[in-house]
From Swiss-Prot:
Keywords: Ribonucleoprotein, Ribosomal protein. GO terms for molecular function: structural constituent of ribosome. GO terms for cellular component: ribonucleoprotein complex; ribosome. Pfam families: Ribosomal_L31. GO terms for biological process: translation. The lineage of its organism: Bacteria, Pseudomonadati, Pseudomonadota, Gammaproteobacteria, Enterobacterales. The gene is rpmE2. This is Large ribosomal subunit protein bL31B. HAMAP family: Ribosomal_bL31_2. Part of the 50S ribosomal subunit. PROSITE patterns: RIBOSOMAL_L31. Belongs to the bacterial ribosomal protein bL31 family. Type B subfamily. It comes from the Bacteria. PANTHER family: 50S RIBOSOMAL PROTEIN L31, CHLOROPLASTIC, LARGE RIBOSOMAL SUBUNIT PROTEIN BL31C.
């Protein structure tokens, strides 16, 4: 079996900058940045979106109503359909 072919698995701090949330997770991601968190130094990765900020997970997603489009279509073209 080959030696030293697996990536290093370590604890990493992920920072969701949009909501200022920090996550301490095991990962193999490579980064040169570090941060002090809870009194220890960890590798640091910034995120734009995570489960703390994504609309699907926060319940703030917008659903588009098709009722207005259908009503507008029927108003314009309903007289032609019979």
């Amino acid at each position: 079996m080959k030696e030293n072919i697996h990536p290093q698995y370590r604890t990493v701090i992920f920072h969701d900058t949009s909501v200022d949330a920090y996550f301490k997770v095991g990962s193999t991601i490579q980064t040169d940045k570090t941060i002090e968190y809870e009194g220890q130094r960890y590798p640091y990765v910034t995120l734009d979106v995570s489960s703390q900020s994504h609309p699907f997970y926060t319940g703030k997603q917008k659903t588009h109503s098709q009722e207005g489009n259908v009503a507008r279509f029927n108003k314009r073209f309903g007289r032609f359909v019979n």
